[in-house]
Amino acid sequence: METDRILCGDALEMLRTLPDNSVHCCVTSPPYYALRDYGVDGQIGREDTPAQYVARLTDVFSEVRRVLRPSGTLWLNIADTYAGKGNQGDSVDPKYPNGRTGQTVAINRRVEGCKAKDMIGIPWMLAFALRDSGWYLRSDIIWMKANPMPESCKDRPSRCYEHVFLLTKSRSYYY
């Protein structure tokens, strides 16, 4: 009997290869919105708007929900992003050469409904969208990062936490 398997590839494509109700638990940290460029066309996290990003992840997690057993759980790690002024294009961190996988990319675009430097609210936008699509939103765990990435901002505290949401497919689940 196979007890574990690691699948590498496009999340939707890999999930579609799995049978219904076959997975006990999913632990994931999808690419954050507008923070990295992995050099792959159509990559998650490079959508034009937060709403498109949330919709795309909702589609992926719809497949996760299909493959989870009724008692299964989803543990979702996600962080927020800040809105830009919209006066510049994308900028690449100069310490990474062009084409390097995972280069840091700051997207400086306006976000409808947000002022420049506002937190967008991605974690809760996604959590509420998943709940609306049928997931049970059971818990929000705050992961305090003891050694967070340094930030050059001088007008707010550094981000030192991320959200880990516990979502379930049904009211009765294995915990």
Where are these regions (language model features)?
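Core catalytic lobe of class I
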Residues: 1-175
